[in-house]
Amino acid sequence: GEKDNGWSTSMLLTHWQGDGYADGTFGQGQTYFLSLGYKMNDKHNFNFLMTGAPQWHDQNFTKSIATYLERGRKYNNNYGYYGDQYLTERRNFYHKPVFNLNWDFTIDEKSSLSTVLYASTGNGGGTGNRGNRIRTEDGYIDYDAIYAYNLSTSGAGGAYGAAEGGYVTRSSMNMHNWFGLVTNYETELSDNLSFNVGADLRT
């Protein structure tokens, strides 16, 4: 709640993680929220807000019913091991925090101005495969064999770096920076009529 000096604070922090229903569908993430408010006087009220939810989770792409009948419902052919290290070719990851600075200005009993300055910076995406997989007998990706094969190639040419029949894990990225300002002025002209005008600026 608001203290006698006009300041108020609210915050939240959570964490989750799990291994999913299907094999090779691990994931984890956090959620955070911070709000700082300051009521300068009866006319001016400020609030700063920051929130975000970084996360990553591994995926299980579509397969035929025949494959599930053969391998089981939890079968996932998008992961494997390099030595004893778990690796996946299908991972989604993202973090897009949002920052707001709000200013509420009570001009008089009939007029008010509300302004929000905001920013959102984020990046994320998903991984996938390019090239020829090598699989183990039980249907998982054989990263040891892939590593050995890739070493035997010259590394020249090939689409997306998968040269001479080799294999790579690629990442499709989405990166952006949003900045903007939203402001709204409202005044009461009479008991039955009000005037409202605003602006929405963004980059």
Model-derived segments and spans:
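Short, well-ordered helical secondary-structure segments
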Residues: 13, 27, 33, 84-88, ...
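Flexible, surface-exposed loop regions and adjacent strand-edge segments
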Residues: 27-32, 62-74, 130-140, 203
